[in-house]
Amino acid sequence: MDLTESFKTLSDKAIFTIAGVGQRDGIPAKEADAGWPLGVVRRPDGDLIVVDYQWHRIWRIDKDGILHAFAGDGIAGRSGDDGPAIEARFCNPHDLFQDRHGHLYLSDLGNNTIRRIDYETGVITLVAGTGQVGRGGDGGLAIEAEMDCSCGVAVDEAGYIYLSSEWTNNIRRIDPKNGLIETVFGQIARHYPSEQGHSRPFAGSGLSLGGYHGDGGSAKEAGFNHPEHLVFDSMGNLYVCDNSNDRIRKIDMKSEIITTVLGNGQRASNGDGGPAIEASILMPDAICLDVHDNLYVGEKYGFRIRKVEHETGMVRTLVGTGEPGFGEEGLHGSVTRCNSVEAGIYADPDGTVFWGDCSGRTRRYDGQTGIVTTILGGTSVHDDEAAVGGFLNGPGGLSVGPDGHIYVADVWNQRIRAIDPFTGIIRAIAGSGA
């Protein structure tokens, strides 16, 4: 397609797409252009639900692999509570938890809120947060409390909702009977929101910054360092993804004793084939448990998916070589590269694992064969093809060269790409996506 001729025929104020397919549903998910898929769970009906952090939506992938819009209209904002989730607006939705009834709890990170989608009705409601960044509200209603980077959410069998506060380094709990919120684990830090919307420590007695201590004692007095995600096992114990301590920790909810189950605190990724507590993990940023209580962990900077066997306590790598990259398609997990794994990971009973990585895809590890495939986001960015069919993931800066070539910073695909004005073909001129 000769773009120069198309431009000549444009009328005033007309819009003409020259690159990118945008947000499409009703097509095979593996052919869709996703933004940044993070949280992922399987619904009781068998469909997969995927959070798209970048495009402010939640997707549904049906059993035939077709992609459907599930919640959100794709425009960043905060609206729609007490109405259909499909009409709601989110801002950088992050983590996702499904309770035993199929209800979904969502960390709407950019809005500093926790929201719930009813399984039967599809209605979305506010669970916690005023939208203000901060730490206040303990002892009062959760919907009147401030949130400070509450990435992780988990719900126990009794309906109590647990939130991990990444920047205040503790865990809060919401009582389902009265809606009150309190801090239950981790020393209480006092913070205030900065001009940039981040949380900074406020000097004074009782201040607790991130750290590592407390194993073997009460979780109430334990030190966490950016606890990001939470999950319960079949016995009701709470697992904490203690990100910057490079550990996964477990809280016995009967005794409230905390221990480490994976990671020795070294900033590395090794120890496969040995005890998980002697191994190292590099910034764990996603955790889940299967029905057998096997633990699965995604490493943000180790670029791996690791598994800890419940029966033996031994750890091994399922996917990843330790080198970041777009990742090979259809190969065994042992030779397939991962990009950073953040927030989203889910495991079926047979050990099949789904996760989102920062290449803009949701991927699948087959628990029987070990083969890795892409289920959402495409296996290619479609270089050397017509730009209108190309995948752009967070296009940023744009410039036109003296020869008419259009240059685009394809941010999340980690490339600089050029569009030929005479052929309409897009190609990468810098960056490999790694």
Q: Which residue ranges define each predicted feature?
A:
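Residue-level detector of Asp-centered blade-edge/turn motifs that repeat once per structural unit
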Residues: 42-45, 98-101, 155-158, 232-235, ...
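Blade-level signature of beta-propeller repeat domains, shared across WD40, Kelch, NHL, RCC1
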Residues: 347, 406-425, 430
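Conserved beta-strand position repeated once per blade in WD40 beta-propeller domains
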Residues: 39, 95, 152, 229, ...
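Gly/Pro-rich loop segments of beta-rich domains
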Residues: 2-36, 66-92, 122-149, 179-226, ...
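Short loop/turn segments immediately following the C-termini of beta-strands
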Residues: 53, 109, 166-167, 243, ...
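A short loop-to-beta-strand structural motif that recurs across blades of beta-propeller domains
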Residues: 56-59, 112-116, 123, 169-173, ...
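Conserved beta-propeller blade signature
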Residues: 47-49, 103-105, 160-163, 237-239, ...
